[in-house]
A protein has these predicted regions:
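Short Lys/Arg-enriched helix C-cap and helix-to-coil transition segments
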Residues: 130-137
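Basic nucleic-acid-binding alpha-helical/helix-turn surface characteristic of O6-alkylguanine DNA
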Residues: 1-113, 164-167
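Thr-Gly-centered strand-to-loop micro-motif
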Residues: 103, 133, 147
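…primarily DNA-binding HTH/wHTH and HhH modules…
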Residues: 140-167
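Regulatory, non-catalytic segments
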Residues: 114-126
Length: 167
């Protein structure tokens, strides 16, 4: 697994943490994560397909955050994610840009209507947030629920999509 530092220069408050990290396998992106102080920031030398996947993901995430991209085409590698969680994430990936669905909605589509809490847990463990848009999944009562990058970022990602979806 290779990693690439993804620096985002922006005035948006939900990205006041100055950068994200990406990890990939030869099959696709395996992780999107917030880089925190104290982590090794030395450059990683990627090669071949992994390097291309990381470059593509960086470009697509920057376009998304600039409101210029509504879906991702970069391959994602969820092979290490348990089957139920993978199915829930694949369903979340189908939620249209600028829209939200509930944890229960996903559970029902998976044929497990009583598994809304398990869907919530799957979203909380999403290894590739933003690319697989778990921020578009909310509680049935309309409350946001949780988000691995924090609720303020979830709110801001949803607002970004609402704002750019209006055009």
């Amino acid at each position: 697994m290779e990693q690439l530092d993804l620096r985002l220069e922006t005035q948006k408050p939900f990205l006041s943490v100055s950068h994200l990290g990406l990890a990939a396998s030869h099959a696709g992106i395996t992780r999107v994560f917030l880089r925190r102080g104290g982590m090794d920031r030395s450059p990683i030398r990627e090669a071949g397909r992994v390097r291309e996947i990381l470059k593509e993901a960086r470009r697509e995430i920057k376009e998304y955050l600039a409101g210029k991209r509504t879906f991702f085409t970069v391959p994602v590698d969820l092979s290490q994610v348990p089957p139920f969680e993978r199915s829930a994430l694949e369903m979340a990936a189908q939620i249209p840009y600028g829209e939200v669905r509930s944890y229960k909605w996903i559970a029902e589509r998976l044929g497990k209507p009583d598994a809304a809490r398990a869907v919530g847990n799957a979203m909380a463990r999403n290894p590739v947030p933003i690319i697989v848009p778990c921020h578009r999944v909310v509680r049935t009562d309309g409350n946001l629920g949780g988000y691995s990058f924090g609720l303020i970022r979830k709110e801001n990602l949803l607002e970004l999509e609402r704002r750019h979806n209006a055009y």
